[in-house]
Amino acid sequence: MAYFPFYIDIENKNILVVGGGTVALRKIEKLSPFKPSITVVSPKICEEILKFNVKAVEREFDDNDLNGVFCVISATDNEQVNSHIFELCKEKNILVNTVDDKEKCGFIFPALVQKNSVTVGITTSGKSPIYAKYLKEQFLNMLENTNSDTAETLWQYREYIKKNTADEELRKKVFSALMSMCLCGESIDVDVVNKIIKENS
């Protein structure tokens, strides 16, 4: 099965994590930087999870826990509970990730690389996590060795360039030249942008 890489705004979205151990912790660590509203349901929740901004509910899973949730992470060590949650989510059209059970996943977690405004998600569709990890390290190394302000600078002058260029072909040339300067660590201001526009017109 191939997975389409949607990038979704999950800020303040209600995400339910069922399970309170290290597996659940790893998922919460990945989700937290994107500021969702996370509820953790488990009879026992590890201390590391409680350090995150989560709502902790220390009891067994209840079917009503699914009310109003955007997606579910099923991370218990009980296969019967995981299967029950998966079937309920399928009935209610709720996205569910059953940890370590690809057949019971409506979505999967990619290996994530984050650097300033750049987010890269890498997946082998669940076939080889170790290869995904290797690729993650390669991308991270590449980003570490480029100007970290490139995306922000291009965004800063995006509207200005669109307003001051006559056509799409010219815009592409200007953005390409600007990006090359950013990657070389050169200082950018309006005068520099105007010069690039003039040189490519």
What are these regions (language model features)?
Residues K51-N67:
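Glycine-rich, highly charged phosphate/nucleotide-binding loops
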Residues I38, A56, L95-V96:
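Hydrophobic beta-strand scaffold residues
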Residues T98-N147:
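E1/E1-like adenylate-forming module used to activate ubiquitin-like modifiers
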Residues C71-A75, N82-I108:
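ADP-ribose/adenylate-binding Rossmann-like module
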Residues M1-K44, I49-K51:
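Hydrophobic, well-ordered beta-alpha structural blocks that scaffold small-molecule cofactor pockets
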Residues G21-V23, Q80, G126:
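Residue-level detector of alpha-helix initiation sites
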Residues G126-S201:
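An accessory alpha-helical subdomain
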Residues N14, F70-C71:
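Structural motif
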